[in-house]
Amino acid sequence: MIEMEPDTHIISALVEHKPGVLQRVAGLFTRRGFNIENITVGESETPGIARMTIIARGDDRVLEQITKQLNKLIDVIKVRDLEPAATVKRELCMVKVHAPSESERSEIIQYTNIFRGRIVDVSPDALTVEVTGDSEKIDAFLELLRNFGIKELARTGPTAMSRGSRTM
C-alpha cells in the first residue's frame, strides 16, 4: 500500500508518449537521489501524450527540485503537484485466490460483491478477482482474502487526477 504520509507527494506529468521517456524520468530521480514510491503511465486524452502519476517522498524543497528537474526534460510537457484533498486516486488489483470448495467460492464471491469487484477468471481450484478503489479499500479486501490463500497478486499502484473541472 502507498500511504500518503505528510511528506508524500502526488506528481502528475504530461509527457510525450514515446520510447525512452519513462527511463529518462526514472533516471532523473535516481541521479538526484529521490525515491519513487510508485509510478504509473498511460494514455491521456490527447493522442501522442501520456500521463504519468508519480508518488514520491520528500519535503517541499525536494518537491520543488523534482518539479524543476522534470520540467527541464525535453519530453515533459507539464508537471503538477496534486493536492491530496483535491485529488481522485484509484488503483487496480487482480488477485488469484485458492477456492477449491463451493463454500469458499461462495464466500469469496460475497466479499467481491461487497467490494464491488468482479470475478474475471474461474478454474477448478481458484478464482481471479479484479477490484478497483483507493489503496485502503484494496488492502481491506486483500486482508479478507488472505485466509483463503492468495496464489497470485498484481497491483497497479495509484493513478490520480484533480477533482472537479480543473485540468493539467
Curated annotation (Swiss-Prot):
Keywords: Amino-acid biosynthesis, Branched-chain amino acid biosynthesis, Transferase. One of its GO terms (biological process) is L-valine biosynthetic process. Its EC number is 2.2.1.6. The keyword Metal-binding does not apply. It catalyses: 2 pyruvate + H(+) = (2S)-2-acetolactate + CO2. The keyword Transferase applies. GO terms for molecular function: acetolactate synthase activity; acetolactate synthase regulator activity. Pathway: Amino-acid biosynthesis; L-isoleucine biosynthesis; L-isoleucine from 2-oxobutanoate: step 1/4; Amino-acid biosynthesis; L-valine biosynthesis; L-valine from pyruvate: step 1/4. PROSITE patterns: ACT. It comes from the Archaea. GO terms for cellular component: cytosol. Residues 10-84 form the ACT domain. Pfam families: ACT_AHAS_ss, ALS_ss_C. Belongs to the acetolactate synthase small subunit family. Dimer of large and small chains. This is Probable acetolactate synthase small subunit. It comes from Methanothermobacter thermautotrophicus (strain ATCC 29096 / DSM 1053 / JCM 10044 / NBRC 100330 / Delta H) (Methanobacterium thermoautotrophicum). The gene is ilvH.
